[in-house]
Amino acid sequence: MKSSEIRQKFLQFFQSKGHTIVPSASLVPGNDPTLLFTNSGMVQFKDVFTGKETRSYTRATSSQRSVRAGGKHNDLENVGYTARHHTFFEMLGNFSFGDYFKRDAIQYAWELLTQVYKLPAEKLWVTVYQEDDQAYDIWATEVGVPRERIIRIGDNKGSRYASDNFWQMADTGPCGPCSEIFYDHGPDVWGGPPGSPEEDGDRYIEIWNLVFMQFERDAAGNMTPLPKPCVDTGMGLERIAAVLQGVHSNYEIDLFQNLIRAAARETGVTNLEDNSLKVIADHIRACAFLIVDGVIPSNEGRGYVLRRIVRRALRHGYKLGQTKPFFYKLVPDLVAEMGQAYPELTQAAERVAQVLKQEEERFGETLEHGMKILDGALAGVPAGGQLDGTTLFTLYDTYGFPVDLTADICRERNVEVDMAGFDAAMARQRDQARAAGKFKMAEGLSYEGADTRFEGYEKLELDGVKVAALYVDGTQVERVQAGQHAVVVLDATPFYAESGGQVGDTGLLESGGARFAVADTLKIQAGVFGHHGVLESGSLAVGDTLLARVDAVRRARTVRNHSATHLMHKALRQVLGAHVQQRGSLVDPDKTRFDFAHDAPLSAEQIAQVEAIVNAEVLANQPTQARVMAYDDAVKGGAMALFGEKYGDTVRVLDIGFSRELCGGTHVSRTGDIGLFKIVAEGGVAAGVRRVEAITGDNALAWVQNQNALLLRAAGMLRTTPADLPERLAQVQEQLRTLEKDLEQARGKLAASAGNDLAAKAAEVKGVKVLAASLGDIDPKALRGMVDNLKDRLKSAVVLLASAGGDGKISLVGGVTADLTGRVKAGDLVGFVAGQVGGKGGGRPDMAMGGGNDAQALPAAVASVQGWVDERL
């Protein structure tokens, strides 16, 4: 039975039991900052299990794409060396949200395994939690599993409820016993049943885990029965495929064998058992699907995990002798295997291959050099020894070797790595970076009052606000005097505090004779706004009542740029593709600067398309709408959650024209308020990240007017109209090319004429003609032509010509005819003269060039040539 058929039969079976088939969630958890990657089927249902969210169904089934690499769940170092470790795997699961419980879950599992997949019942063993008599009885009396094949597992991890058969989401919250199903590979394979001393052997392999969430655990460890118990099950597709296909290693199943053959094809390897092929076959799955879900290789977070996996695959390709990009060529093979089950892979295949190829080319430049450094270092380390932390860090910092990649190589050679030394070197670098950094917000502002009430969405002026706290030089004070720089915390404010890329507001705080100029607004902690500025007059004390007034003109320019950013983000996705995701932004009164995931520069046509789309939305003058709702409802409604951002349970959804994003910033009331949108710059800021700068409103109008003025000025200089300027410029360019050609011909004639005059000045040294001369300001190219001409005229000669320009720079050209290069070399001659005029030179035996900058020394240097030649003849 093929892997694709196993997956399909699983989903269809549970669909027939009233389950809704739910598509795989992204590998990037949508709303769980505690997880680096989605690593199980229950992740997308976490809030349903905890009661924070409800769905339209109470039964679900899915095939969840999962990754375990980096963070707590990290299988990377074992991949390729064991039968069942993977970075990427598929978790088949069925779930009940307060619907059925143990009886149905157990019976469904048994029916699928024995009647649909037709596994021999006598090959199946099960485990239950020691105290879970209900599950034990269902297995024994209702399903009919012999009691000798039902094993109770107690608290085998050192504390109460710490057991392989007791699951808990965290220290507190939903938890409960679980029942695991094992397959017996038979007595020919070493190992014992679960719970025995030999349980780590490969004879009994876990294929399915049924989790029964029936308790709520509090901080004191007390267990309270849940009013609606739930079921969460997980069965690895790769493991069940190995069982159903009669193989012992996951890498022997059809899906992996096809990828291994593809890897062998691209690396030229014939031994399909090579572990490096297994590594490559595993890693292409993880890398491709991470890119599909918006992760790109980088030096931090999820992007760095992806980079580590890619580079580990490339190192194994290098080990197999492949030094050219090959990894990206496996994408079509992966699409053939998994594209039908996951259409998103097929849709993004070209993009995936492009990202992988670029990463291969980037790392390929340093891989060979890094391997030479590592090989040299390991040559001096005996088996069982240790590679020093300094070398580890050099490979990481200079050659881009992730430390686990170096450790992988060392392990193959039975060498340990000095992680303590590496960590120390890394810490030193971080300390240096911190020392060099400058932080905008003073650290250590302690505030224990209520959060600031923000009213700046509707108001730019707010009277009657109270001073809640004052800070001078980081210290909390009761009063501020005129002339002092301070931070003011208010109970309420119309000032927006810098967040989400939008700069903070400026303006005034006034009361009687007190006037505080706000230069910036920043959060001193979550929910607390600090107004930074200087008290221009009067005094200010805690408890004072003020009028807070935002600089309305500056705010208006800022919100125009912010709203335009949303429209531009949407337009970029339309023009370039759905892979475009925000990587950073800065919105201030002057511009919007937007960083996004994309690999290639934008063409002029693409920029024009984006501008046209945004300005069409501006002209439509649609009203904007902001709503507060649950995060999951927002995402279901099509709101874009920005990559890498963390959101609370409740979010603000902003509709601007055709854009819908989660955003807490300030915006225009109607799209027409943006006025005009213009992109003024585009470039790269990092690997796979582009930056666009754009302006709006009066800034955009001023830019257009300035460009028009430049156009009119240029047209006037060429005595034409702006409309005819391109044609006129083409004419001027053609005229320039003709003049340059004529000039070149004139220079050639001049050189020939000068050569005729110089030839007569050649001296004879031991029967050899020697000519050395300084000619004033002559182009180096013309100088070389003159040397060639003189060599032809003199037939057998040594020639050195020099020119000194008005800027003091000296050009030297030396030539030696072929019959003399055995005794006199042009490169040596030019080097000798250049050394006397403060420069360097060199070249071939028959022709060489050089230069210098000491014009005063040039006459003596030229005069020394005859003596130098005489010494060599």
From Swiss-Prot:
GO cellular component annotations of the record: cytosol
Cofactor note: Binds 1 zinc ion per subunit.
InterPro entries associated with the record: aa-tRNA-synth_II/BPL/LPL, Ala-tRNA-lgiase_IIc, Ala-tRNA-ligase_IIc_anticod-bd, Ala-tRNA-synth_IIc_core, Ala-tRNA-synth_IIc_N, Ala-tRNA_ligase, Ala_tRNA_ligase_euk/bac, DHHA1_dom
Subcellular localization, as worded in the UniProt entry: Cytoplasm
Any one GO molecular-function label of the UniProt entry: tRNA binding
Keywords in alphabetical order: Aminoacyl-tRNA synthetase, ATP-binding, Cytoplasm, Ligase, Metal-binding, Nucleotide-binding, Protein biosynthesis, RNA-binding, tRNA-binding, Zinc
Residues that, per the record, bind Zn(2+): H562, H566, C663, H667
Reaction(s) catalysed by this chain's protein: tRNA(Ala) + L-alanine + ATP = L-alanyl-tRNA(Ala) + AMP + diphosphate
Family in the record: Belongs to the class-II aminoacyl-tRNA synthetase family.
Function: Catalyzes the attachment of alanine to tRNA(Ala) in a two-step reaction: alanine is first activated by ATP to form Ala-AMP and then transferred to the acceptor end of tRNA(Ala). Also edits incorrectly charged Ser-tRNA(Ala) and Gly-tRNA(Ala) via its editing domain.
Protein name (database record): Alanine--tRNA ligase
Organism the protein comes from: Bordetella petrii (strain ATCC BAA-461 / DSM 12804 / CCUG 43448)
Name of encoding gene: alaS
